[in-house]
Regions:
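Active-site metal-binding loops of divalent metal-dependent hydrolases
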Residues: 20, 172-173
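Active-site entrance/lid segments in N-terminal catalytic domains of soluble metabolic enzymes
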Residues: 1-162
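Conserved active-site-proximal phosphate/metal-binding subdomains
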Residues: 146-168, 174-316
């Protein structure tokens, strides 16, 4: 499974754990890195000094590469980036903003930079900004999404046609078969959020994990489209948002309704009714809470099995 993504980040398998809010602390990131993937800390739900603490704990827990995922719209972005550089982090994934703002600055500090996009148009802007890799995320993904609503199956080939840097697929991938499919479409690695959010090492509340592991197809939907498109589990909060949107609520009204701490309330504190429950469509394929080590071994084994089966079928 060695390729440009593996060489870029110094990892054994081209499997990246998404840096999700309220899920991706040092325990999860270090476990993924120790298992041969790339663990990412989710800075989007951390105060700057909390991030520093998680970076240091992650360093103590693994001698393998790990990184930090940073939403560029974060209000204390300057402080976060200072801490990342001060603590010697070598890999940063950015999202939700202009990649030109930070890419060259981080690279000058010896940091590899990947940026998350939801369209080929934004992917071209990333390549122009000089990023080291691009994460193309389809709208199957949990949490914040692009407005295009392009599926991963359609997005990866489109981005592959216009970009030459290593391409990482994200959105709806939770299995070894999914990894192989992403490679067939042109990706050289995958980023998985949902699969790792539902592990023992994830910092998400047990209530949240348990609910996600009992989902059926169609139990998550994209909402908040007038504000910031987000994939959520249908619950009381989701219904509140849907009613507001049907009545023509403005972006400001939706922002006020969202308020502060909805994601923390749902994902981290386990409020299944009033909280914001962000998870991807592919959660409906999962039924068992596993350790990261179990997940990684299963992904690699299933990938290799699927590859052999594919090769055996090549008779036409």
């Amino acid at each position: 499974m060695q390729n440009r993504v593996c060489h870029l980040f110094g990892i054994r398998y081209p499997i990246i754990q998404g840096g999700m809010v309220w899920c991706s602390g040092w325990r999860l990131a270090s476990a993924v890195s120790n298992a041969g993937g790339l663990g990412l800390l989710g800075a989007g739900s951390m105060h700057p000094e909390t991030l520093r603490e998680h970076i240091r704990k992650c360093k103590a827990a693994t001698d393998q590469p790990f990184g930090v995922n940073v939403p560029l719209m974060y209000p204390e972005i300057e402080t976060l980036m200072e801490i990342i550089q001060e603590e010697g982090v070598k890999i940063v994934f950015t999202s939700a903003g202009n990649p030109k703002t930070w890419t060259s600055k981080l690279q000058q500090a010896g940091i590899k930079v990947a940026h998350v996009v939801s369209s080929s148009r934004f992917a071209m802007k990333c390549e122009e900004a000089g990023v080291d890799a691009i994460v193309a995320e389809g709208f199957e993904a949990g949490g914040h999404n692009g407005r295009e609503e392009t599926t991963t199956f359609c997005l990866i080939p489109a981005v592959k046609k216009v970009c030459s840097v290593p391409l990482i697929a994200a959105g709806g991938i939770v299995s070894g078969e999914g990894i192989l499919a992403a490679e067939a479409l042109g990706a050289e690695g995958v980023q998985m959020g949902t699969r790792f959010a539902l592990t023992e090492e994830s910092s998400a509340h047990f209530n949240f994990k348990d609910r996600c592991l009992r989902l059926n197809e169609g139990d998550t939907l994209l909402t908040l489209k007038q504000f910031s498109p987000t994939r959520l589990i249908k619950n009381d909060f989701y219904k509140l948002i849907e009613e507001a949107e049907q009545k023509g609520a403005s972006a400001d009204e939706l922002k006020a309704l969202l308020g502060k701490g909805r994601a923390k309330k749902g994902i981290f504190e386990g409020d299944l009714y009033e909280g914001e429950l962000e998870i991807g469509q592919a959660a409906s394929q999962l039924r068992q809470l596993q350790t990261v080590d179990e997940v990684m071994k299963e992904l690699v084994e299933d990938y290799r099995t699927a590859l052999r089966q594919m090769q055996d079928r090549q008779n036409w």
